[in-house]
Design a protein with these regions (language model features):
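A broadly conserved sequence feature marking short terminus-proximal activation segments
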Residues: 1-12, 53, 153, 166-172, ...
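NUDIX/MutT-family hydrolases
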Residues: 137-170
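Acidic, metal-coordinating catalytic segment for phosphate/diphosphate chemistry
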Residues: 2-53
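A short coil-to-beta-strand element that immediately follows conserved catalytic motifs
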Residues: 22-23, 104-113
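Conserved Nudix-box catalytic region and its N-terminal flanking loop in Nudix hydrolases
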Residues: 2, 46, 57-100
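Active-site-adjacent beta-strand/loop module that shapes the phosphate/pyrophosphate-binding cleft
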Residues: 115-136, 149, 166-167
Length: 183
């Protein structure tokens, strides 16, 4: 299948048989997906919902907090992100993520938008979060920086587009940086 993403799931979660690419009739016509040849289970490979936050620190002159993930090479700073937990709403999830990753007290939030991130097979649900308090990073983050709105730079994918939309809604013309190619 041309352009098919690489799959991490290799075995059926019901019977442990090795999965195979099998074409089968679906509502929209025939579709080739990873399926179990023994029991018929289908690995749908649906996009994962990811939460992201433009964190505006109200006790730091409304500067925006960007952080660098400890696993990332170089000095790229981005929005606070994380996965929803079972049983929580997206607003609850982003408040939890911001507090877990930065120790900030979340005061309010509003939806910026929903963005595709095809490379990671994710759907990003982005919020503007107002917060305050001392910043203490979780081990998953290496460092953070606070930026005035005019000093923020966006990137042309995923959460960078959410940051650009947030800036535009506040009357700023987003400035973009070019990220190095992924190797």
């Amino acid at each position: 299948m041309s352009g098919a993403p690489s799959y991490e799931t290799r075995f059926c979660s019901h019977c442990a048989t090795a999965l195979a690419m099998v074409e089968q009739a679906e509502d929209g016509g025939p579709k080739t997906r990873l399926r179990c040849p023994a029991c018929g289970w289908t690995h749908w490979n649906n996009p994962t919902p990811v939460l992201a936050a433009v964190v505006e620190c109200v006790d730091q002159g409304n500067q925006v907090l960007l952080a660098r993930n400890a696993a990332w090479p170089g000095r790229l700073f981005a929005l606070i992100t994380g996965f929803m937990e079972a049983g929580e709403t997206a607003p609850e999830g982003i408040a939890r993520e911001v507090t877990e990753e930065t120790s900030l007290q979340v005061l309010g939030q509003s939806l910026i938008g929903v963005y595709e991130f095809k490379r990671m097979n994710q759907i990003i649900i982005a919020y503007h979060v107002t917060a305050r308090g001392p910043i203490s990073l979780s081990p998953e983050l290496a460092e953070y920086k606070l930026f005035a709105h005019a000093d923020l730079r966006c990137w042309r994918a995923g959460t960078g587009l959410a940051l650009a939309d947030w800036l535009t809604a506040r009357g700023h013309v987003p400035q973009f940086i070019e990220l190095p190619p992924r190797t």
